[in-house]
From Swiss-Prot:
Glycoprotein keyword on record: yes
Transmembrane helix found in the keyword field: yes
Function: Golgi membrane protein involved in vesicular trafficking.
Biological process annotations from GO: vesicle-mediated transport
Membrane topology annotation: Multi-pass membrane protein
Pfam families: Cg6151-P
Transmembrane segments: 12-32, 44-64, 89-109, 112-132
Primary localization: Golgi
Protein family according to the UniProt entry: Belongs to the TVP18 family.
GO cellular component: Golgi membrane
InterPro entries in the record: TVP18/Ca-channel_flower
The entry's keywords: Glycoprotein, Golgi apparatus, Membrane, Transmembrane, Transmembrane helix
Source lineage: Eukaryota, Fungi, Dikarya, Ascomycota, Pezizomycotina
Protein name in UniProt: Golgi apparatus membrane protein TVP18
Length: 153
């Protein structure tokens, strides 16, 4: 199934997975840039939220690209924690918590982390809609969904 065909299925979990990838990129890039700029102004709160955003980006990477759990040497407890986030509702909840944490960074100072918070919120909403509509979670084959791991191993 091509990427175009995946989007034509109108399954919100596919939309959520791709928005998750965009969220991961934004969390890492904006977290890094805000951390570097806040180091010079010594804004400890923004540095802390920037570090959290970068940690979230790595969590999202392992959640959205399941093939990495097979390739990367990780602990069994980390693998078990990531595998718990497998249903649409669990993913919606996880993204909701991550979005809330990043939105809280706006309390002290408004930074570009708002863009990451918006995308995390949209991702959580897509997974929530997929769960509410009763759509089964479908992993994108482009991102290492069903069948890709078996082809590599």
């Amino acid at each position: 199934m091509t990427l175009k065909e995946e989007f034509q299925t109108r399954n919100f979990s596919i939309y959520g997975q791709w928005l998750g990838i965009l969220s991961m990129i934004l969390c890492f890039a904006l977290g890094l840039s805000n951390m570097i700029s806040s180091i010079f102004s010594l804004n400890i709160v923004i540095i802390a939220f920037s570090i959290l955003a970068m940690v979230f980006s790595f969590v999202i990477l392992f959640v959205e690209v399941p093939l990495l759990l097979r390739i990367c040497p990780t602990s069994s407890s980390f693998d078990a924690a990531i595998r718990k986030i497998s249903t649409n509702y669990m993913r919606a909840g996880a993204y909701g918590v991550m979005a809330l944490v990043i939105w809280l960074s706006c309390i002290s100072t408004r930074t570009s982390l708002i863009a990451a918070a918006v995308f995390l919120t949209l991702t959580g909403a897509c997974y929530g809609l997929a769960g509410a509509k009763g759509q089964a979670f479908v992993g994108s084959k482009t991102l290492g969904g069903q069948g890709v791991a078996q082809m590599i191993v």
